[in-house]
Amino acid sequence: MGKRKRQQAVPRSPTGRELVILSILLKGKLYGREIQFAYERRMREELPAGSLYTTLDRMEDKGYVRSLRNERARDRYGPVRRYFRLTSAGKQTLKRYARWTALATASRRRRG
């Protein structure tokens, strides 16, 4: 038992929630509650912790993020936190979707 087996990163399209989380992680490494609060502020909707960690695990399986464990809260007696950071694949994915969105927006303007 123990660790979950990670699959080989397979290129798959990110979900809308994953794209929002990728953009949040552009700030640098963050732990789960920081990501949750930033998501809820940006999207103006609740993101339950279970849904957040399921999404983050899926993003790690896809190769978009990497988790770092064993970092303690500011005081050394705080809880061990699981931090997440973007990988180069996550950054590339975010750039690709930003370009696609810009092209789609420009195309709509020309038609409209």
Predicted feature residues:
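Short, Lys/Arg-enriched N-terminal segment that forms or immediately precedes the first helix
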Residues: 1-11
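Amphipathic alpha-helical dimerization/coiled-coil segments
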Residues: 3, 89-112
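N-terminal helix-turn-helix DNA-binding core of bacterial DNA-binding proteins
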Residues: 11-51
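Short, charged/polar surface micro-motifs in flexible loops or helix N-caps
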Residues: 27-31, 60-62, 89-91
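Basic amphipathic alpha-helical segments that dock to polyanions
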Residues: 52-54, 58-59
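Beta-hairpin "wing" of winged helix-turn-helix
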Residues: 62-78
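Short beta-strand micro-motifs in enzyme catalytic cores
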Residues: 80-82
